[in-house]
Amino acid sequence: MSDLNPSRAVTCYQMEKLARAIEAFRNSENAYSKEIPAQVIATFLYVASHDDCNKIDMERELELSSASGSRNTDWLSDQHRLGKPGLGLIVKYRDRTNRRRQILQLTAKGRQLANTMKQILYGEQTI
């Protein structure tokens, strides 16, 4: 690296890659995605790594309340709270065998973002 400013020199390339992957998430189309909470990113990463998971399992694994899980998945779906547009990264639908259970699945846009993040972190794609 030829940067002459030592405060800007990368000292850990793995963490720098992680920062770029998170920045890819924050650079979504919605203006308010810049201020996205870590819980929402964690929820997205859980769904990306457990596609077709149920919401209760996600909440249990991430130690979220049902209300937090709903807020996070609303933010990631097409419709955010109070009529605001969501990020459109996941869809929620009812389980056919248990109507009380919600299933979470990546949209094409969500798969594309997950692939971008994997490419940044590992140089690989395809979800």
Language-model segments: which ranges?
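N-terminal leader segment of winged-helix/HTH proteins
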Residues: M1-A38
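N-terminal helix-turn-helix DNA-binding core of bacterial DNA-binding proteins
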Residues: N27-S65
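A short, conserved structural fragment
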Residues: S77-R94
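Extended hydrophobic secondary-structure segments that form protein cores and membrane-embedded regions
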Residues: F44, I90-R94, Q105
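Residues in the recognition helix of alpha-helical DNA-binding motifs
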Residues: N72
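Basic, amphipathic "hinge/linker" alpha-helix immediately C-terminal to the N-terminal HTH DNA-binding motif
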Residues: R96-A114
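Amphipathic alpha-helical dimerization/coiled-coil segments
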Residues: N5-P6, A24-S28, R111-I127
